[in-house]
């Protein structure tokens, strides 16, 4: 939670000092069980929510992954017609091509990353509205960067994460707790008199049409190097 982030970082620095790692990047694989436990205990004093998505690669095959990737690529242009602006058609076609070019390993990472962000968004809103509703007024997404400069994969992920989650939200809107205080979250919600024409047939007809603005929710999203981001280091430790 933002309200405790600075305090959490300071406590993490104190732990690193005990480990003789002050000012250094700490990797989870470098810590022993006792040191990892101390991180978990420290985070346990705050309303920290930990999410993970996993896959058993032993149950997957290259053919199955390839078919899944191709199906996702086809979905990008499935609903495009001559009525759409040529620039949108061109952009969508380029995204489709780049997705198909991903290796199966990167594609799996792509899918898990999308699933994780969507799951974190749903669970975090329900979790914090019951504990710290003011936290729902700001969302900052920081992702571990692969290199010092943004990679082609990361650019593709950034270009696709918003439309993918937006499409998912049409069919599965965020679950919201009845009677809870969502006043801080109102800035991310919108209301239209009816379902927009471009969504006719995609979502169920309802008046008024209430929706969550995924673009606003993901506005503050960036890839950062783990060396300069304590939060990413903490996630790496928890994942080990």
How should each PLM-predicted stretch be described?
Residues 2-240:
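Phosphate-ester processing/binding pockets and catalytic centers
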């Amino acid at each position: 939670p933002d309200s405790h982030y600075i305090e959490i970082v300071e406590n993490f620095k104190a732990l690193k000092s005990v480990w003789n790692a002050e000012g250094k990047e700490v990797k989870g694989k470098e810590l022993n069980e006792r040191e990892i436990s101390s991180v978990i205990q420290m985070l346990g004093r705050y309303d920290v929510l930990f999410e993970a998505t996993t896959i058993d690669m032993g149950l997957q095959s290259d053919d199955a992954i390839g078919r899944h990737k191709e199906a996702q690529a086809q979905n990008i242009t499935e609903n495009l017609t001559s009525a759409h602006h040529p620039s949108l058609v061109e952009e969508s076609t380029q995204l489709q091509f780049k997705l198909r070019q991903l290796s199966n390993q990167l594609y799996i990472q792509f899918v898990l990353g999308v699933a994780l962000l969507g799951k974190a968004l749903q669970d975090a809103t329900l979790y914090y509205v019951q504990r710290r509703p003011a936290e729902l007024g700001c969302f900052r997404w920081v992702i571990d960067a692969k290199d010092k400069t943004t990679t082609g994969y990361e650019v593709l992920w950034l270009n696709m994460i918003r439309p993918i989650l937006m499409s998912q939200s049409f069919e599965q809107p965020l679950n919201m707790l009845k009677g809870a205080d969502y006043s801080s979250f109102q800035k991310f919600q919108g209301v239209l008199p009816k379902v927009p024409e471009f969504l006719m047939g995609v979502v169920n007809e309802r008046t008024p049409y209430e929706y969550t603005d995924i673009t606003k929710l993901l506005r503050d999203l960036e890839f950062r190097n783990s060396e300069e981001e304590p939060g990413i280091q903490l996630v790496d430790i928890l994942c080990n």
